[in-house]
Amino acid sequence: MKKNLTEIVFILDRSGSMAGLEDDTIGGFNAMIQKQKGEDGEAYVSTVLFDNHTEVIHDRVDIQQIQPMTRKDYYVRGCTALLDAVGKSIHHIGNVHKYAREEDRPEKTIFVITTDGMENASREYTYDRVKKMIQHEQEKYGWEFLFLGANIDAAKEAARFGITEDRAASYHADHQGTAVIYEAMSEAVCNVRASRPVSADWKRRVDEDYKKRNK
């Protein structure tokens, strides 16, 4: 394992229901990346955008080389093929690690999944298949998976993926809610990069904001 190297994979919803939140999403993502550039250790970043289809805009790019996301990268359209996005991403990163030299394999891996609605368009992967993939990576390699969902019961949906409740959070799909989830993502990623446990506190502000405004 390569010490102090973290594999970070962001799987971000850009389906049509995200309309109106483009600038908030772009701003939140860019602020998070900028903060992570100042943290200790190396990191490879993959950013996967999904609607009906999956588009990879960063494929294991050194975090210091990541350019700010723009409206050319992130625009909304289509439905929610979440299972395909997650399944393909796990398969790709898993294969890279499998065939990498031991000294090049990242010490830590974290996937951050965001969606503002239910899966409704995947054609290649099923819940059962993705759940087995996630559980395999969690148990054998210690990969972390976070699940942030709007307009759904995030904990319930995450469980279908094999992601535990303490790694899932519901949020409001608006300006404030989007800002809060990117701050939470950044905190969790910082913990993983520093080899600290991801405690339930990573999502405290997300939970507080959701409950306060969920009336």
Per-segment meaning from a language model:
Residues 1-215:
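Acidic, low-complexity intrinsically disordered regions
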